[in-house]
């Protein structure tokens, strides 16, 4: 100043905490991301921290501006989080389909190349073989059987509905 005095001060410039984001799968169907192969009942969310709060979100695909994304199928979803100062952080998450539920039905009884031992008999059987989906499975046969093998069958057509742990179903029949 005019008297020759000098004043000194120091200023510390501090960075805000680094903005981070972590997307995660929030749907859980017995360990699967979506209930059935091809279903769109999955969900995901993103957690943001650091930066300057007042976050906005943008998901692709989908264009959602929420921190959660619902009614989605298998695939990779990317989210960009923007804080109040315009800083960004991106993360992604991948939802996977469970194996497709499949069913085959076959005659399992064999009496010298015949399905039933005698004309008019009821000692035939049929087996439902299931793969994919999410175990355990339930069986509902048209004759009332509720196991993988329907027994005591007479000649005719029998149908079965198999349901997995997530409610996915497949139908089959045998004559």
Per-range role (PLM):
Residues 1-175:
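Proline- and Ser/Thr-rich low-complexity, intrinsically disordered segments
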């Amino acid at each position: 100043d005019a008297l020759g005095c000098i004043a000194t001060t120091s200023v510390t410039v501090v960075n805000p905490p680094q903005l981070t984001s972590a997307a995660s799968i929030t749907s859980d169907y017995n360990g699967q991301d979506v209930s059935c192969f091809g279903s769109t009942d999955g969900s995901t969310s993103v957690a943001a921290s650091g930066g300057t709060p007042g976050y906005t979100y943008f998901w692709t695909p989908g264009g959602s501006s929420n921190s959660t994304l619902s009614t989605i199928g298998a695939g990779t979803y990317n989210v960009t989080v923007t804080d109040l100062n315009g800083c960004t952080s991106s993360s992604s998450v991948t939802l996977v389909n469970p194996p497709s539920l499949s069913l085959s039905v076959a005659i399992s009884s064999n009496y010298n190349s015949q399905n039933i031992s005698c004309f008019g008999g009821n000692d035939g059987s049929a087996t439902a073989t299931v793969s994919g989906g999410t175990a355990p499975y339930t069986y509902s046969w048209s004759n009332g059987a509720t196991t993988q093998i329907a027994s005591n069958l007479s000649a005719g057509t029998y149908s079965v509905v198999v349901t997995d742990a997530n409610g996915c179903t497949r139908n089959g029949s045998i004559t």
